[in-house]
Every structure is written in structure tokens, then in C-alpha cells.
């Protein structure tokens, strides 16, 4: 239906998403959609940081609406060009799902979010390939400490990062059930995907999977999910 590949990179905080997205886009000659900075203009985000139970739903729905608009416009703008998205819509679903496990969403709020998510994304092309940068909580905490971003160090404790990783597994399974090909890159076992050798391997996998029939399932396409 489309003449371009849509590749989305997902993963926990500190798993290397942004670095891999930039290098992979360059490697594939693709348009890069970097991680958005909607948190800077989301009117509900600072409120949610102060009272997550009260404001998380409004904040997450605002993020979802803007990310859907962004990807729709991006796909309208490209002509026969591959697109690599850092985080994007699947990460909106991941964050919202983590609110449920963390107790910031009620079951009713999660069902409402899900129904709105399904409606807003109904006519948005699904990615051909999603790359899931899988890493343990201990590993990403170490990366967060190394890069020293004050907001992350303050707000991203072990419990929060664990809820994100569990929700990433949920999103990966959901995407696969919808026919999306998922490459799982084990950051600790395989190393950062941004090294020259690993980037070459990852680009090769994506190119192969983008032309693989829906019924095919290469052994590395969904490792352990």
C-alpha cells in the first residue's frame, strides 16, 4: 500500500533509542522523526508530575493526540522515503499502560484510554518493523546515572522503570499480534546497537523483515517476547 518503510524504535529510558534512531536513519537513508518534546508544551504534564492520579489520563491523552497528528503529517510529507521514528505512538501506549500497573489509572480510565487510542490510530499506518531495545532495569538505571539528566535522576526510580519495562513487553506482544514485525535487540547481551558492526546487523534485519511475508517469522524477529 505504501512505498516506504516505517520503522519505530521503542525502549526504556536510557536504552539507546535516540542514538540508534539517528544512526539508523542515516544508514537507511530515511527521514528521522526524533523523540518529540511535547512535554515542554503539554499543559497537563507539570500537573501530572505533582498529582499523577488526578492528571495522568489528561496528560497521556494530550500526548497521544499530538503524536498521532505528528506521524500523520510526516507520512503525508514523505515521498517514497523510509521513515525512522524515535519512540512515537507505541511509546504513548506503553506509558499509559504503565499508569495502570503503577496505580495512576483506574481500570475504567485504562479502558477509556484504550478505546480512544484505538479510535485515533485506526487510520494511521502501522509500522512495518518495530525495534525494541530491551534492557534490564539495573542497566538503564546505570545509564541514567551516567548521563546525569536531573529530571530523570529525580523521577525515574527502580519501581517506575520496572513498570515501563513490563509495559514495553505488553506493547511488543500487542504489536506482534497485530501483524507488526518486532526485532528485539538485547542491549546488554548484544551491546549497543549504535556500534558500526551492530548497526549494520540491525539495518540488515530491518531490510529483510520489511520484505518478508506476513506469515514468515525469522528466529530473531521476536526473541523471548
Positions of PLM-derived features:
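Hydrophobic anchor at the beta1->P-loop junction of P-loop NTPases
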Residues: 9
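P-loop (Walker A) phosphate-binding loop of NTP-binding proteins
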Residues: 12
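Conserved lysine of the Walker
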Residues: 17
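Post-Walker A alpha-helix
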Residues: 20-21, 25
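Conserved substrate/cofactor phosphate-moiety recognition/catalytic segment
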Residues: 26-66, 96
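Glycine-rich phosphate-binding loop used to anchor ATP phosphates in small-molecule kinases
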Residues: 55, 59-125
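A glycine- and Lys/Arg-enriched "phosphate-lid" helix/loop adjacent to the NTP-binding pocket
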Residues: 94-167
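NTP-dependent small-molecule kinase module
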Residues: 141-225
